[in-house]
Amino acid sequence: MPREIITLQAGQCGNSVGQQFWQQLCQEHGINKDGNLEDFATEGGDRKDVFFYQSDDTRYIPRAILLDLEPRVLHSIQASPYKNIYNPENFYIHKDGTGAGNNWGMGYSMGEQVHEDILDMIDREADGSDSLEGFMMLHSIAGGTGSGLGSYMLERLNDRFPKKLIQTYSVFPNTQDGDIVVQPYNSLLSMRRLTQNADSVVVLDNGALTRIAADRLHVMNPSFEQTNQLVSTVMSASTTTLRYPGYMHNDLVGIVASLIPTPRCHFLMTSYTPFSGENVEQAKTVRKTTVLDVMRRLLQPKNRMVSTNPTKKSCYMSILNIIQGEADPSDVHKSLMRIRERRLATFIPWGPASIQVALTKKSPYVTSSHRVSGLMLANHTGIATLFKRIVAQYSTLRKRNAFLESYKREVPFKDGLGEFDEAKEVVQGLIAEYEEAEDADYLTKETAPTDEAEDKRAG
């Protein structure tokens, strides 16, 4: 029984990442550039229908909706080698084509104006699914479209599909040297929606992605294409258990339930090893990829795709390792024992200290130089330090009332700047929740989340 997932790509970053993600899925499932199954793709055992549907002429078409307020990236996708795999009706480019000017308010307001057209596309895709499980959204939170239009769509999806899961892959800005001066404003406003309207958020930040790409590829300034390749590798790895199902973690709700012990703490960080791929071929090869080696590397902070400054109390709430390739379950058991003996991972004091492992097969159609590769999805309290940096940078700008005029012109701010204050309160509540989770008496505390009434997730 397929449990379909509809993918929404919003803005320049979301669509660039999405383009590479679909290319990777096509290669892994033996689908050619026109959407036809290659003659050699006869192995079976994979579920293509989670992410693709078959058209009347039996071509595989992504269940994807591509949204942007300016045409450049979508036009480049429409002229790319894989242009024929998409449903042309699922491209939405705003008729003015002016973009959102790196302004969350403008992206949000434009979403409000055009939401009926976009929801028609989503309804059409949902009606074409037998048993829709949920949505995946790809976007960044620093600019205008991915953050503003993305926020608006999260709210609408919650209203229209209250029982469906929403998972996002959200690219956070490099908080050290971002190229958009107003990114703290856009990030904070988006964070509120990610907290209240998503069930699970995979956090990737540009600072960490650039560092990992530079480290592995030996290039000083990795291109966006190279960092997007890392994101699409993580996305394809995190969906392998859905596409090559085993007994466990074979649907999105299973993955989310195993990683998120309390509903608000649903921001996940990832590690992946070893990196290889078309655009990453300069990556230094790691000679011996045993299960233990892969699992140990996944726990190394330098492999995390999030820049955090963990404190002494920071700890894991949950870990799911997705191991692809030739892995023997007894090796996994031994590796887990070794990790426990060496105390390589510190867990919350009030829950089970368990690393969950899902073994999945690799695509038979993609050659890999590694026997085993692994992705770690982890819920770690240290992620709150990233949110603290966003709040601190927001407060610095707000104190000076810097760059607020362009926001005041937009609909969400017509009655003042309360939208900012509410967002800050929600994010501070989230930070407090993660910090409280580090205490042994977390579950027995009587404090309820302040914004429970606002919480719209499918819990």
Curated annotation (Swiss-Prot):
It comes from the Eukaryota. GO terms for molecular function: GTP binding. PROSITE patterns: TUBULIN. GTP binds at A142, G143, G144, T145, G146, S147, G148. Keywords: Cytoplasm, Cytoskeleton, GTP-binding, Microtubule, Nucleotide-binding. Residues 440-459 are annotated as: Disordered. It is found in: Cytoplasm, Cytoskeleton, Microtubule organizing center, Spindle pole body. The keyword GTP-binding applies. One of its GO terms (biological process) is microtubule nucleation. The keyword Isomerase does not apply. Pfam families: Tubulin, Tubulin_C. InterPro entries: Gamma_tubulin (IPR002454), Tub_FtsZ_C (IPR008280), Tubulin (IPR000217), Tubulin/FtsZ-like_C (IPR037103), Tubulin/FtsZ_2-layer-sand-dom (IPR018316), Tubulin/FtsZ_GTPase_sf (IPR036525), Tubulin_C (IPR023123), Tubulin_CS (IPR017975). GO terms for cellular component: cytoplasm; equatorial microtubule organizing center; gamma-tubulin ring complex; gamma-tubulin small complex; half bridge of mitotic spindle pole body; inner plaque of mitotic spindle pole body; interphase microtubule organizing center; mating projection tip. CDD domains: gamma_tubulin (cd02188). Tubulin is the major constituent of microtubules. The gamma chain is found at microtubule organizing centers (MTOC) such as the spindle poles or the centrosome, suggesting that it is involved in the minus-end nucleation of microtubule assembly. PANTHER family: TUBULIN (PTHR11588). Belongs to the tubulin family. This is Tubulin gamma chain. It comes from Cochliobolus heterostrophus (strain C5 / ATCC 48332 / race O) (Southern corn leaf blight fungus).
